[in-house]
Amino acid sequence: MKLDKSKQKEINKICVVGLGYIGLPTASMLAIQGYKVIGVDIDEERVKTIRDGKLIINEQGLMTLLTGAITSGNLVVKTEPEEADVYIICVPTPATADKNGKKCDLICVLSAVNNIKPYLKDGDLIIIESTIPPKTTEKIYDDISKNTGKNIYMAYCPERVLPGNILKELVENDRTIGGINKKSAQLAKEIYASFIEGNLYITDSTTAEMVKLMENTFRDVNIALANEFAKVSTELDINVWDAINLANKHPRVNILNPGPGVGGHCISIDPWFIVGSSENAELIKKARNLNDDMPKYVASLIIKEFKEMGICNPKVGIFGITYKGDVEDTRETPARAIIDYLLQNDFEVSIYDPYAKDFEYPLNTIEESIKNSDALIFLTDHSEFKNFEKEDIKEISHMMKNKIVMDMKNTLNHNLWEEQGFNVKLLGDGKSWIVKTL
């Protein structure tokens, strides 16, 4: 969609604060549409990298988009904001521990708001994309109005994209835009309409905040149900994957897949923002705690299984540490806690992940993680793992001390591995585990 030149006169400059997974693609997209964009990030190294035309995240198509935005002269990146007509805040909102579990830490959002306050003028529009608890936009708006005396517009428009497919979803996905008032929502809609092909739905800011939290909480609660089914199935000698497949034949049933836990910057965090906003969020809290406990359950299952098999101080290859398949993102990954538990119980761990770049523990080659190992533990469903062929598996079998595979995401072609003499243990398949209950 091309930029309406009449609107370009109204909005001469946009300042995007936070140049991470969401901010950088958004800033680049707006610049390509013809807006003058100032991209701001407090990380000097990140700003330098972007200025040099290099990627800070591995995202398909982003290099081309970023290069076009910079060479057009429409995108300039800095460490400090400057006067603009629109400010879009795309900074992290992590969760920190509190008495109820976890709570939203707004320090980055509030810092971003404070940094732009000196540049605000009457008629400016502030848009928050960061995930925040209900009523946060209202509170920030009231604070700005009280402490600056400026008559501004303000809206909340949460991102709704999947790492690994950000640019496509940034353009094609529907968006919810919540304004402090109708004029704020309408102004924000005009900005997003310049590049979004999906539908744009207008509401108030508090509803929009809740919408984002509901989307991710829905998935978290349903994953918790699947994980509980996996635990029960293990106890009852049932294969949960077969049971889920058959249950989903019902036209009104769609059970999600179980796994070793929930990770990423959204689903594992956002439900806590509802829990912290209401005492009635009992189911949400229980589901979140269940998913948070899955890494401990998985690690305990592994530890006890090795004891039952009589293998002491086992060496295991951990295959996959990112929070989901085919991405490099390790934020909130359940693999972290699983590895911690194994190391605390005298396991020797060698980690291989074809996507991850940085992690708390050393990353090794695939050969290093296989050689002389007692088992391979698959925690992430990368395509590379799914595509292991007969000859690959045969070669792997010759390198290992014991032929054991533990598949926590139902990633592998189990028949191929069993043909090569592997003992395959699948999360949620009671028949494959010696240990049934913890």
From Swiss-Prot:
EC number(s) per UniProt?
1.1.1.336
Give the Gene Ontology MF terms in alphabetical order.
Answer: NAD binding; oxidoreductase activity, acting on the CH-CH group of donors, NAD or NADP as acceptor; UDP-N-acetyl-D-mannosamine dehydrogenase activity
Q: Which domain of life is it from?
A: Archaea
Annotated NAD(+) binding lies at: Y21, I22, D41, R46, T93, T131, R331
Please name the catalytic residues of this protein.
K212, C266
Please name the top-level EC class of this enzyme.
oxidoreductase
Query: Can you tell me which family this protein belongs to?
Result: Belongs to the UDP-glucose/GDP-mannose dehydrogenase family.
Q: Which residues bind UDP-N-acetyl-alpha-D-mannosaminouronate?
A: R160, V161, K212, N216, R219, H250, R252, G263, Y323, K324, K409
Task: List the InterPro entries hit by this protein, alphabetically.
Answer: 6-PGluconate_DH-like_C_sf, NAD(P)-bd_dom_sf, UDP-Glc/GDP-Man, UDP-Glc/GDP-Man_DH_C, UDP-Glc/GDP-Man_DH_C_sf, UDP-Glc/GDP-Man_DH_dimer, UDP-Glc/GDP-Man_DH_N, UDP_ManNAc/GlcNAc_DH
**UniProt-listed GO biological process terms:** polysaccharide biosynthetic process
* The protein's name in its UniProt record: UDP-N-acetyl-D-mannosamine dehydrogenase
* Reaction(s) catalysed (UniProt annotation): UDP-N-acetyl-alpha-D-mannosamine + 2 NAD(+) + H2O = UDP-N-acetyl-alpha-D-mannosaminouronate + 2 NADH + 3 H(+)
Q: How does it assemble?
A: Homotetramer; probably dimer of dimers.
Q: What does the record give as the function of this protein? A: Catalyzes the four-electron oxidation of UDP-N-acetyl-D-mannosamine (UDP-ManNAc), reducing NAD(+) and releasing UDP-N-acetylmannosaminuronic acid (UDP-ManNAcA).
- Which cysteines pair up through disulfides? They are none
